[in-house]
A protein has these predicted regions:
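Sec-dependent N-terminal signal peptides
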Residues: 4-13
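Domain-terminus/edge residues, biased toward the C-terminal soluble/receptor-binding domains
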Residues: 148-149, 160-165, 169-230
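Active-site-adjacent loops and short helices of periplasmic peptidoglycan-processing enzymes
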Residues: 19-172, 176-180
């Protein structure tokens, strides 16, 4: 089994000339200047893809919108369901929350953004909307508002689902919305570690799942995503 790494990067200032003849082994991709919206490079940008963990960008945006309108607080506590806990036991990237743990929205967001925890996504989605499906409806409503015309979300984590689809064009729109509207929260995407002080156990420290943060190439956040393929 191989893994496909999906990476989207929005860079602040690069010249078009630099990317006139890129050597990129990918089926689809896009590079956008944040300030001007100029497309510096694109490769079949409207091809349908499975966004994998880049789905979590929208999960965070929905939460940030609710916090902004005082419908949610970073200090709110959500109870972890068995449904959320099971994802921490399934070999996926996890925050390692346990059934009936009381976890703050702030910790869940860090678990999602830094540790890319699928279990944290479900706990947050259920806490906000009552079910992950209801939360996915909120995600799709927001996607429509942003202008993501080729995207459909079916879950909060990006876990494999043939109907959870997007394009790199839409992901670029979503990423810019995040950076523009929530610059303070966007800083979380650049944090290299997160320590979960779990109940009844030793703290769990995890590194950011974005490998580009460690390569000193000027990347300041957003997400990567992995898909397993036969």
């Amino acid at each position: 089994m191989n893994r496909i790494l999906l990476i989207l990067i929005l860079l602040i200032s690069l010249t078009t000339k630099l990317f006139s003849n890129p050597n990129i082994q990918a089926r689809t991709g896009i590079l956008v200047d944040y300030h001007s919206d100029e497309i510096l490079f694109e490769l079949d940008p409207d091809a349908q893809i499975y966004p994998a963990s880049m789905t979590k960008i929208m999960t965070a945006i929905v939460a940030f919108d609710l916090i902004k309108t005082n419908k949610l607080s970073l200090n709110d506590q959500f109870t972890v369901s068995e449904n959320a806990w099971r994802l921490s036991q399934a070999g996926y990237s996890s925050m390692f929350i346990m059934i009936n743990d009381q976890v703050s929205v702030e910790d869940l967001l860090k678990g999602i953004i830094i540790a890319s925890g699928n279990d944290a996504c479900v706990a947050l989605a259920e806490g906000i909307a009552g079910s992950e499906q209801n939360f996915a409806d909120m995600m799709n409503e927001k996607a429509g508002e942003i202008g993501m015309t080729s995207t459909n979300f079916t879950n909060s984590s990006g876990i494999n689902d043939p109907d959870n689809v997007s394009t790199v064009t839409d992901i670029a729109l979503m990423s810019k919305y995040l950076i523009k509207n929530y610059p303070n929260y966007y800083e979380l995407f650049a944090e290299k570690t997160f320590t979960w002080d779990r109940t009844g156990g030793e703290p769990i420290k995890q590194g950011n799942r974005n490998p580009l943060l460690y390569k000193n190439v000027g990347v300041d956040g957003v997400k990567t995503g992995y898909l397993a393929v036969e």
